[in-house]
Amino acid sequence: YVLIPLIVFLVSSCNVTTGETSIAGKYCDDWATKDANGYRFSNNVWGKDTYQNGTDYTACITVTDDYPAGTVIEWSWPSYRGGVRSYQEIYIGRKPWDTTGTNNSPFPIQINNLKEFKVEFDLERSYSSTGFNVALETWLASDPDGGQSAITDEVMIWLHEGSEPSPSGGNGNSANLALTPSHEVWRNASHSGWDYSAVVFEADYLSGTVDMKLILDEWKWLGWVSGEEYILDLELGAEVVLGEGSLTINKFIVTAN
């Protein structure tokens, strides 16, 4: 398998180009999914259990022709603590459960071949509930074309931590990231069949840049990853446990090569 390095600049302010069908609108169906401008959104309600859309909860994503800029993610879930209900999101690449990835994606990239991997963002969140986080996520796999069985690692960056959910595992580890602002690192080496790690900022970090390569380099130094793993995607969304709220995405740019 030959991997050709790519550089992708996904600019959040670009308008729909001539000939491209507009996806502007409000989407409230479970798992509603659309692609445009190199990004995919998914109204991901993976933990809904027996709750019924429109009766027990609502979950919507509103997009404009400036997509992903101006995207608004909204939700309203019962107050019962039953685990993560949804991770409504925008992403580039291919999730392990996807058949195909997004257009012009730089992924998959093997960690050992990674030269640059950063995420720039500007976000706004609601304050009506504390039952959610705002997080970046990337999946690592042993096979660049693999599905769930190929997953080796789930890496999350919590830009906002609410009262729910809690990171998996513990934070008493040896990770020492040259990363600001202040943060903790959590790890669970036996989470759902793969390793889980999370960088959790101690205060909201909703506008700025995260150097994902710096994080993966540290994980490699610690032996948490070997460097042979493939980065499949980069996701941005809100993990919701309970209550109502919203997330507005003003900017979301991923650079990877």
Located regions from the model:
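Sec-dependent signal peptide recognition
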Residues: 1-5
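Bacterial Sec-dependent N-terminal signal peptides
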Residues: 6-24
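Ser/Thr- (and often Asn-) enriched beta-sheet segments in non-cytosolic proteins
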Residues: 17, 58-64, 72-76, 91, ...
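Aromatic (Trp/Tyr/Phe) and Gly/Pro-enriched flexible surface segments
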Residues: 19-107
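Short, hydrophobic/proline-enriched secondary-structure or compact coil segments at domain edges
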Residues: 71-75, 117-123, 136-138, 231-240
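Extracellular-facing segments of soluble proteins and assemblies that are Gly/Ser/Thr-biased and enriched
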Residues: 85-174
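Short helix-loop boundary/capping segments
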Residues: 142-213
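Long, compositionally biased interface segments
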Residues: 197, 201-257
